[in-house]
Structures are given as structure tokens and as C-alpha cells.
Amino acid sequence: NSRCRASDRMNTGEYTNILQICNCTGVAQIDDITVEEDGLLVDGAADLRDEGKSMDEITDWVLEKRKKVHHQFYSTELKFSRRSGRMSGAAAAIGTVLGICPIMRLDDKGRIIAYDKVRGKKNAVARTVETMKRHAENGENYTGKAFICHSNCLADAEATKAAVEAAFPHLNGEVRICDIGTIVASHSGPGTVAVFFFGDDRAPEGSA
């Protein structure tokens, strides 16, 4: 997993104290499984707050949706895949020459799964949108929100945004583009574009 849960880094007493503080201050403690999806969940929770939903209703919604946030992403910079052990040095060198883009997702445990590879950015965008059609709520009739994050490749993010908006005409608003944070970017590298959306339950490792 690319991140450690807070409970894994604390002793039992510290974790129990945090839970007690949350209970006393009206703060809900939720294990989001993976940090990359927080923006979409927080945005949805804020919408429910504005609709007048209670804390319990919002918490239940987040708990239900946390495994339904999909993360589809591709990368054009293979040396970071080599550094993280997802690709051998020889494969990274050959892939760079051929313009290979790994297509990745997060599984139900929040682990990065490289499930396909294509040649060129256009094919990477097309494969990402194709996968989104298969997993998004109501398929091409998806009416939820979609976010895109990128690491120093705004043009690629904008091209992906255009493809997503063309494929999903009923989106809830314009696709929002954000920067990938420095911690995640240090793992994924520059040239990474990620698409976030609500869909079916994220599949475990070994599934498409």
C-alpha cells in the first residue's frame, strides 16, 4: 500500500485517545482506506451538509462510498515505476523508448495495480475512459462528479478532461482538475494523470 493507516503508526493507547477526542468533539473518525480519494468524498460530504443532512447520515454515506471511488491513472514517466519496484530497469528503458504508458488503478485495499499498458498518451486516455465506462455508476449515463489530478502535466490532464466530458454528457458539473500532492507525486512521478469517479465496488487484485 502506498500509505500507512494512522492506526498502524500509533500504539493502542494513542489511537484510543484520538477516538475518544473525536467522540467528545463531534468529529467522525473514518478510515478512508486510501488518501487519494479524499477530495471526491469530502466534496460529496460537503454537498450533503449543505442539504441539511445529519452527521450520522453523512458518515454513513462516506462509509458506503469509500470503496466505490475509482482511481484510474496512467503515467508517462517510467523511471518512477522502476524505483518503486513495479517495473524492471530493462522494461522501463524499453518502455520509455516505445512510449509505453502503464494503466493503473487502486484495488479494494488501496494498493496500486498495473493492469494494462498501451503505447502513447492518446491510447492511455482512451483506455482510461473505456474503463470508466465499464465501472462508473450507470455507465455512460453517469451523473456524478469526476475529478482529475496530475503531476506536472496539465496539457495531458486537460486532454483527459475533454475525453471524459465527451464520453459522459450527464456529469454533475465540469470535471475539476487539481494537482497531485507532493507525497503521492514522489511515488507516482511526473507525467501522471488520475481520474476519480464513483462506480461499483473496487475490485481486488487480479481482477480487471
Feature names for model-found ranges:
Residues 1-4, 8:
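Extreme N-terminal basic, low-complexity initiation segments
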